[in-house]
Curated annotation (Swiss-Prot):
This is Probable dipeptidyl-peptidase 5. One of its GO terms (cellular component) is extracellular region. It comes from the Eukaryota. It is found in: Secreted. It comes from Emericella nidulans (strain FGSC A4 / ATCC 38163 / CBS 112.46 / NRRL 194 / M139) (Aspergillus nidulans). The lineage of its organism: Eukaryota, Fungi, Dikarya, Ascomycota, Pezizomycotina. The gene is dpp5.
Length: 722
């Protein structure tokens, strides 16, 4: 039986101001707050785009962890990475180099007079992901990553050799990944040392060491989403651990990744601690997030079991550097943690998706064996980063559906939970003014085979005695979820503030609700998930009196785009006034054109040639489904989307046009699976919201609603006049 769970007094009219696409895109975007060793100040970066100047600005700021007061540190856009050396000294990467075109530099600055810092080292290329520790000797040991040649030297784009031909030649896959054609360069972690000179200033001591190049075909961080969480440096400065996809198996067919351990000075060949022959046996999936304990004696990391499944459950493992023994923790815990931090030598905090939120969990290492279930430290919001501030307190950075950024102080005592909210974006940013927890609630309802969760997001001035058209949003993945978190791309509140009640379900295949729900989508893309969505729509129709399903619209991206295409040829498709597909698959046989072959082979239980019927079982392009197409349909597909190539969107548009279904095709030649450029994002929002508003009637009801005509880009239409 379904139930509506109000997170606050949403029955009262919301005081929120309407969140427009322009406000969403131009609102400040902030990084995690990183505390100094004493835990009284944190540093974070911010960036902001202006539609007046059509430029972005960036800055670094300080957050007082007692008062929540924010003060500027620097607005120098060349400052790209900052780490604390002590309570009052910062080490950072300067993105320019006066002597080396395309190079960068390491600088040291004091907190009280940041502009008076000095250059400590020259770097031969563009570097990112700085991590550093100060050893007992006073030396600074650091690591960062850059592109590399196979000979171990750093790749500098401005100094690189160019060829007269544009040809690309491949003898193996990948050919391209995400939005990039592979080349002979790769990501690599480099290590270096800074020593104090006789003038009490730090300076480079020796050349950088490439810690990845000694392993043929290794790469760290691993693209497209790898970053500094793919590696770590021990507190004593002696060791570096990094993740790399396994170089001994075909990377396009496996998710297998190893954690390599190597001396910081590169004096020994990196060793894969969980490579072939290591214990526990049979654990061969993706590895990530290596983190050293504060005493440098242990290394925690996450690993999946299945070498072909990107959404397998992650388990925490502890590697003892002395004995080389590996111990799994909380193996019966039905969650999949994605981040780890040690608070002391015997305690770990893990972050994990958890029923539509991102919560933190406390794990005492010695007690967390067997069927141990961790206790929650947070509950309800989405914690994206966390650091030990001092004593028993964490500094937690995250977001919610109504706030793009918050920083909380959270106790390591589960009974205390959140001690204090220091700052929240919706309380300090004019663009988000008035947004709050009253804008959202959630529902649980009976799905195809189990209870299903969905978020409900309300429009500006919501009054439950009135009715609002339904905006039905379908997430991608397919192993993904709608969370109580902010998005600058698919933001439910922006949809809601056009005048909709947004319902965002987490059907079969969604993550954060246990393995069984996540795994049940395998070879079942148009089965149980579709039935869950039908039941979600029916629950809304029958139970939420303030929602007008007769004027409903639906939209989805990636797998959500596939589902919208599937809905177009299904009974549910006739219940919507308009549909939007963003980068969705349409033709079953086209799945072989993707890059990560292990994904499709796992989802459909075999290769394209061995189990072709599995690939075609839920085919939106089947003739009998095409004959049912009738609902006006907007298609977005981008040229740099190599996961689902642009031909998928063009194929769907061709069919809709020939069938006479009102349709439009939106294409960005310089965007990938996502739309991230601010100006492109504005057009995306204008077209998506304008399309939905046109057919739902919102455009007639709300004079401030976005319309298709808001876009200044000309529309190509060479059809003869009707």
């Amino acid at each position: 039986m379904g139930a509506l769970r109000w997170l606050s007094l949403a029955a009262a009219a919301s005081s929120a101001l309407a969140l427009t696409p322009e406000q969403l895109i131009s609102a400040p975007r902030r990084s995690e707050a990183i505390p100094n060793p004493s835990g009284n100040i944190a540093v974070f970066s911010s960036s902001q785009y202006s539609f007046d100047t059509h430029e972005s600005s960036s800055a670094w700021n300080l957050l007082d962890l007692r008062s929540g007061k924010i003060t500027p540190l620097t607005n120098d856009s060349n400052v790209s990475e900052i780490v604390w050396l002590n309570d009052s000294t910062l080490l950072y990467i300067n993105g320019t180099n006066a002597q080396i075109p395309g190079g960068s530099e390491l600088w040291v600055s004091g907190l009280s007079n940041f502009p008076s810092g000095y250059k400590a080292a020259s770097l031969p290329a563009s570097f990112s992901g700085l991590k550093a520790v100060t050893t007992k000797s006073g030396d600074i040991k650091f690591v960062a990553y850059a592109q590399s040649y196979r000979n171990g030297t750093a790749y500098n784009e401005e100094l690189a050799e160019t060829y007269l031909s544009s040809a690309r030649i491949y003898d193996s896959i990948y050919v391209r990944h995400w939005d990039t054609y592979l080349t002979t360069t790769f990501n690599a972690v480099f290590s270096g040392t800074l020593k104090k000179t006789q003038h009490a200033r730090y300076a480079s001591a020796g050349s950088l060491k490439n810690l990845v190049a000694p392993i043929p075909n290794a790469e760290s961080p691993y693209p497209p989403f790898g970053g500094s969480s793919d590696y770590d440096i021990s507190a004593d400065g002696k060791w570096v651990a990094y993740k790399s996809k396994a170089p001994d198996v075909p990377q396009a067919n496996h998710t297998t990744a190893y954690i390599y351990l190597v001396p910081h000075d590169g004096s020994e060949t990196p060793v894969p601690i969980n490579g072939p022959g290591s214990a526990p046996e049979g654990i061969e999936g993706d590895s990530n997030n290596p983190v050293f304990s504060p005493d440098s004696k242990s290394l925690a990391y996450l690993q999946m079991k299945d070498p072909t499944y990107e959404s397998d459950r992650r388990v925490i493992y502890i590697y003892d550097l002395a004995s080389k023994k590996i111990t799994p923790l909380a193996t019966e815990w039905d969650r999949s943690p994605d981040s780890l931090k040690w608070t002391d030598k015997s305690t770990i905090v893990a972050g994990s998706e958890d029923e539509g939120s991102g919560n933190l969990f406390l794990i005492p290492v010695k007690k967390a064996t067997g069927d141990f279930i961790p206790e929650k430290l947070t509950n309800g919001k989405y914690a994206s980063a966390f650091y030990l501030a001092s004593g028993n307190t964490l500094v937690v950075t995250g977001s919610t559906l109504y706030s793009s950024w918050y920083v909380d102080l959270v106790s390591l005592n589960p009974k205390r939970g959140t001690i204090k909210n220091l700052v929240s974006a919706h309380e300090i940013d004019p663009e988000l003014s008035g947004l709050g927890p009253e804008d959202i609630s959630d529902i649980w309802f009976a799905g195809n085979w189990t209870d299903i969760h969905a978020w409900v997001i309300y429009p500006e001035g919501f009054d439950k005695s009135k009715t609002y058209p339904l905006a039905f949003l379908i997430h991608g993945g397919p192993q993904g979820a709608w969370y109580n978190s902010w998005s600058s791309r698919w933001n439910p509140k922006v949809f809601a503030d056009q005048g909709y009640v947004v319902v965002a379900p987490n059907p079969t295949g969604s993550t954060g609700y246990g393995d069984e729900l996540t795994d049940a989508i395998q070879n079942n893309w148009g089965g149980a998930p579709y039935e869950d969505l039908v039941k979600a729509w029916e629950y809304v129709r029958d139970n939420l009196d303030y929602v007008d399903t007769d004027r409903g619209v639906a939209a989805g991206a990636s797998y959500g785009g596939f589902m919208v295409n599937w809905i177009q040829g299904s009974d549910l498709g006739r219940e919507f006034k308009a549909l939007v597909t963003h980068d969705g698959t349409f033709v079953a046989d086209a799945k072989i054109s993707t890059e990560e072959l292990w994904f499709m082979e796992r989802e459909f239980n075999g290769t394209f040639w061995d189990v072709r019927d599995n690939y075609r079982r839920f085919d939106p392009s089947a003739p009998e489904r095409i004959l049912r197409f009738a609902t006006p349909h907007l298609i977005i597909h981008n040229d740099l989307d190599y996961r689902l190539p642009v031909a998928e969107g063009l194929s769907l548009f061709n069919v809709l046009q020939e069938r006479g279904v009102p349709s439009r095709f939106l294409n960005f030649p310089d965007e990938n699976h996502w739309v991230t450029s601010p100006e492109n994002s504005l057009v995306w929002h204008q077209q998506v919201l304008g399309w939905l508003n046109k057919y739902s009637g919102i455009a007639e009801d709300n004079e401030d609603a976005v319309t298709l005509e808001d876009t200044v880009v000309p529309v190509v239409n060479i059809n003869p006049p009707a």
